[in-house]
Amino acid sequence: EDNVKPGDTVLDMGTGSGILAIAAAMLGAEVRTVVDIDENCLRTAQENAEKNHVSIGRGLCGDALRDEKLAEDIGSGYSVIVANIVADVIIGMAPMFFAKTAEGGTLICSGILNERADEVRAALEKAGFEVVNHAKSDDWSAFTAKK
């Protein structure tokens, strides 16, 4: 809630059920794109958005790390990127996240086991992000980073 405001443009990488995209839309953000490697997740996310009377933009399916066309189709200039995915994927995507985030924009990544948090933080910083918050809950970590 503290990082998403009305008018923000949002990309949700690894959308799953769409919960983060839906929350962003409910906060007044313009969710432009949701991405997942599973077509069923994209369908579920769209259904959940409809049930909540919000739009979560276009759904793209595939592996953005391996599919250059998909990576290009995702676009760039997002004021907020949310990603609730495992540490290895966040580490691999950190440079892509940086490239797709608008200047002054925010990356919020979660789904990170605490024992992998230092690796994720290092990858985000190496990509050019400034980590501004590291939240922990039980075995899990989340980072907020600025470009």
What is the predicted role of each segment?
Residues 1-64:
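Conserved SAM/SAH cofactor-binding pocket of Class I
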Residues 40-44, 89, 116:
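Conserved short alpha-helix immediately C-terminal to the canonical SAM/SAH-binding motif I
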Residues 68-80:
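A short acidic, Gly/Pro-enriched loop at the edge of an enzyme's catalytic core
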Residues 79-91:
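A short SAM/SAH-binding and catalytic strip from SAM-dependent methyltransferases
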Residues 85, 109-114:
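Short strand-turn motif at the edge of the Rossmann-like AdoMet-binding core
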Residues 91-106:
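A short glycine-rich, Lys/Arg-flanked "PGG" loop and its adjoining helix->strand segment in the class I
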Residues 115-127:
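Short alpha-helix
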Residues 130-147:
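Core SAM-dependent methyltransferase catalytic element
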